[in-house]
Amino acid sequence: VSETHWTQSGETRLQSGETVIFSGHTEENAIHSEGVGFFLSKEASKALIQWEPVSSRIIVAKFRTQEKKINLVVIECYAPTNDAAEEQKDKFYDQLQAVMQGVSRKDIAIVMGDFNAKVGEANTGYELVMGKHGVGAMNENGEIFADFCLDNDIVIGGTVFAHRRKHKVTWVSPDHVTENQIDHICIARQFRRTLLDVRVKRGADAASDHHLL
């Protein structure tokens, strides 16, 4: 989950048995903004090896898989908005790049979250990491994000699978006029064939202007 607005970092077990791990601002009297986390099922909790609260915008969790020599590393992100200062964007992507460099090549890397990035339909120059099933046109954040994916050889899943538009747009404006595909799930290209689908799940009671992806 992205933009939780929770401060500090921690791990909480719910009465239902699920586990929440989260990362937010750590300063004293920190503002309730940004924030990322994971809601883990009982099965996922048992498979959890370790997790790291990188910042208020990045959290990393490593899980065991059925293949003994391969782990699953999931990186959840909340990127600065398109009109944010360049310094904020640079700091975010520098931190994310450092995390990526720490992931073993033999492990499955999933990078996901709210990137505030429109990558669009045209994939010229990005054919290795993008399909042609994006939405709209690429914006500045989208170009930064696509370049990051190209540099790290990770595929933007939402652009690969053909779906109706309503199952691709992840954010809807309060007046229901503007729709964008700004949340993404990406996977290391060497494991691309293990990603079976990426699509929006509409109608979830999540009190958010984003749909579940």
Describe the predicted segments one by one.
Residues 1-213:
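A shared catalytic/ligand-binding motif for oxyanion handling
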